[in-house]
Amino acid sequence: QRAADAGADGIELNFGCPHGMCERGMGSAVGQQPAVAEKITGWVMEKATIPVIVKLTPNITDITMAARAAKRAGANAISLINTINSITNVNLDTFVPEPTVRGLSSHGGYCGPAVKPIALNMLQACAADPDVNLPISGIGGITTWRDAAEFIALGATSLQVCTAVMHYGFRIVEDMTDGLNTYLDSKGMKSLADLRGRSVQKLQKWENLDLNFQRVARIDYEKCIGCNLCYIACEDGAHQCIDLKSPEELKVGLGPGRVPHKPVPKVREEDCVGCNLCSLVCPVDECITMVEIPNGKASMTWSNYQDRLAKGEMKAIPPHP
């Protein structure tokens, strides 16, 4: 009531902060207990005359449970995510984690670009849940207009930016709005409403994906610099489906920065599972691309596979060598 009397346009209930609050029974201590979050939100809604947003913690097994609790209590919207429990580093001389307070430390709240994938996942989960059905303010690592567009495509109705503003100042908001406007124009979209939520239903459970879909890595030798990072990644961390061959054997040119006779990577497409690791470690843009390979196989999900196995319609697929 005091916030409304002071002229606030709305209230955001902090049920997400993981440090300095939860130790006192507030912040994430509330957001981690849906029943408690529902009760406190209900108390606020009894008196609220302005919109109330419930800010949720990511430090929870299933964030939709807390989102549903906010919905049941009558909240006008939810926001997510707050920061993630973390320890940034340890001083290897004193053996005290940083930051240090009189020789001791505590966990902090991790934020910024690194938490964006976690935020997108939890945003989509809430946006897709029919029992939530609330406006969502998206938070977590938004730094560019592309980040903003991704949050909106996954259902965010508004966005909040903190870390990027701390780094670059409020001028970054102008860059984001300019970029979003240019993007919308390029796609023929009239407003953000045309973008909002377009990706929500594109995310499905793993069991609903096509097991017979096949992609392989292709190397553009005109761009390859011969660093062979893709070979190392595949050999030591993936499926050992990249060989080193001489340029003469492959009948390819030297490419930028390469020297004669130095081996270059060659993908054995029959063994490639399309994990994408090679393209991620490659330092050259679009040198390695993932290409869909038609294999003539009918679409089959994991559920289809299990049903056909149970009916004796097919044999078990052997594991990949």
Segment roles from a protein language model:
Residues 229-254, 259-260, 277-296:
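Iron-sulfur cluster-binding cysteine motifs and their immediate structural context
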Residues 18, 59, 85-86, 166, ...:
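Residue-level marker for beta-strand->alpha-helix junctions and adjacent short loops that shape enzyme
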Residues 110-133, 143-222, 239, 287-289, ...:
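Alpha/beta catalytic cores of nucleotide-metabolism and tRNA/nucleoside-modifying enzymes
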Residues 1-137, 143-161, 205, 211-212, ...:
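Alpha/beta enzyme core
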Residues 216-229, 267-277:
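Flanking scaffold residues of small Cys/His-coordinated metal-binding clusters
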Residues 26-28, 92-96, 173-177, 258-260, ...:
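Short low-complexity, flexible loop/linker segments enriched in glycine and/or proline
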Residues 253-280, 284-285, 306-321:
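Short Fe-S-cluster ligation motifs
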